[in-house]
Amino acid sequence: MLTRPACRSVAYAETFKDRSVVAAYRHRPPHPPGTFDLLRQLIVDRPRSLLDAGTGLGDLARALAPNCDRVDAVDFSERMIEMARSLPGGDDPRIRWLCSPIEDADLIGPYSLITAADSLSWFDLNVVIPKFAELLTENGVLAVVDRSAQVGLREDDIIPRYSLNRDYERWDPVAALEKAGLFERLGQECSGPVPWTPTIEEYIERRHSQNGFSRDRMSRRRATDFDAALRARIAEQVKEGSVRMEEGRLLGEVAGSVVWGRPVPRLRATSERGILGPTRQ
């Protein structure tokens, strides 16, 4: 069995149902245009159907719907789904919004593309990977989408000091799946970087959209002190020139990454390697 680290437990995932987190989510950096271009190219089978697993505010679902016959956009946060519906493209009739954990969702395959943007690490991979394998078309793939944004801010000492996720550790779910023989990587492509220019307040709110920084869960004092620490560090680095601002906006950038491949059915993985056995040499 693949075991998620404690920092990716259901208890921590519940943060994404919080009203404050959903409100702050729109301040996350956008995916670079190249990410969407690549995802469109990965849809080769018909029907041109997309499953966006852990859709959040539906950034991928809303952008790709015009290129699809149908889209199932799934998230376990009702507030996320409500917000996604209200955003541009959220009323596209090709999108079916489903509020459900992906593990239990009532899905109607087959899908020519399954996307997981910043969400795969929160799933029970022992359940969803065999499920995805069954739902894909012959040439369909699972695309794991990531993005990284930076403005040059030194905050590695600030983040752990205030985060409520005391179990945080870096974990790569794709690497874990590959090691277990449950994912066959077919390709990887990066896009960007492209400019990202948030205001200071937008940058801070972006942090509050992340696990560990929900305003609904932090004490008012803790949240206020966290915000003040970020503002002070930004001011310090702007003064020294290591963080740049122009017309009230931070000058940063965002890059995207897509890893795509085929999820491996459980029976095949078990027969080839033993039950989640050692990595094939």
Predicted segments — roles?
Residues 51, 57-104:
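Class I SAM-dependent methyltransferase SAM/SAH-binding core
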Residues 106-114:
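A short acidic, Gly/Pro-enriched loop at the edge of an enzyme's catalytic core
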